[in-house]
Amino acid sequence: MDNKSQRRNNENQKKVEALDFLSFMRRPNCIAEILRQHTQIIEESNNYYYLKMKTKDNKSQGPLRSLLCLPKNVNQKTDSAFCSVDGYNVKNKFLCTRSPNQDSLYQFWSMAYKKNIHIIVMLSPIDNLMRHRYWSLEEDEVFECREFRIETLQVDVQAFYITTTLQLKHENGAVRKIVHFNYTGWPVDNISHHPKEFISFILTVNSARDEVDKLSARNSHTLGPIMVHCSDGFNNSCVYCLLDICISEFGATSNVSVPNTFSKIRQQNRHAISQPENYVYCYQALYVWISSISNSLHH
C-alpha cells in the first residue's frame, strides 16, 4: 500500500463526531469522496479475500475457486446464502440472506427454526414475493412448508412497513412466535428513498428485539439473530445492517464511522453493498437522522 492509500485508509478508520459528520456532508464534493471510499473499500476487501484464500491449501479446489473466493456459508446446491453480520458490540446480530424462492423456501424456514429466529426483516417489495410467498398475508391463515406450520396471528399496517406476528410450529410440537417486519418504502429505482422513515423503521425493529430479548432472558432462552432478507441478500440487507450499527454506535458514543463499519461488514460478507448508490444512501440517511438530533438539541 503506497503512502497516499495508507493516508486514505487511516482517514476511513476515523470515527467522527456529529458536527464533523454534518460538515463533511455539506461539502460540495462529498458525494465524490463517498464514491471514492466505496471503490477503495471494495478493492481492499477483494484483496483481503484473495490473500485469505491464497494462504489456504487450494490445490484440490482449483484456481477458479481461489479467484471467486466463495464464502463458506454459500449453499451452492440451493443457490442460497446465509451470512452472519455482527452488530455494534453484538456478535452475529444479523443473519442476511436472499428472499426465498420455490427452491429455497424450505431452507429459509429450516434456518429460521435452527437459528432460533424471532424477528424477520424483509426489504423486498411484497409484489416480488407473490409467486414464492413464505407466509400468509391474512390473519388466522396458515402457510405450510414440510414439517413447518406458519400461522398468521396479527397484521398491523403502517405507512412504510407492515408488522405481522407469526407462529412457527414444528411437527415435533415446538412453537415459537416470530415478528415479521416488511419494509414497504424501499424504492423501485433504488434512489427515491425515505431516509427518515427507514431510520425510524430500524429503531422500531430494535425496540421489538429488546422486548424479545427480555422475554427470552426470563425464559432462559437464547435470542437468535435478526434474519434480514432482500432480493440478492447482500445489498439492501447490508444497508440495513450498516445503518443499524452506525445508529447504535452513535447512540452509545456520539461518534460514527461509515467507512470503518462498511469495511468490517465486507469482511463478513464479501459482496455487501456492492452498488455505490446504496453506500451513498447510507450517508444520506445518517445525515438526515443526525441533523434531526442536532437540531432538537439546539431548540
From Swiss-Prot:
Record bears the keyword ATP-binding: no
GO molecular function: protein tyrosine phosphatase activity
Keywords for this protein: Hydrolase, Protein phosphatase
Residues annotated as the enzyme's active site: C230
UniProt-listed SMART domains: PTPc, PTPc_motif
Pfam entry (one): Y_phosphatase
All residue ranges annotated as the Tyrosine-protein phosphatase domain in the record: 16-289
Enzyme class per UniProt: hydrolase
Alphabetical list of SUPFAM superfamilies matching this protein: (Phosphotyrosine protein) phosphatases II
Enzyme Commission number(s) of this protein: 3.1.3.48
Top-level taxon of origin: Viruses
Catalysed reaction, written as an equation: O-phospho-L-tyrosyl-[protein] + H2O = L-tyrosyl-[protein] + phosphate
Protein family membership: Belongs to the protein-tyrosine phosphatase family.
Protein name: Probable tyrosine phosphatase protein J4
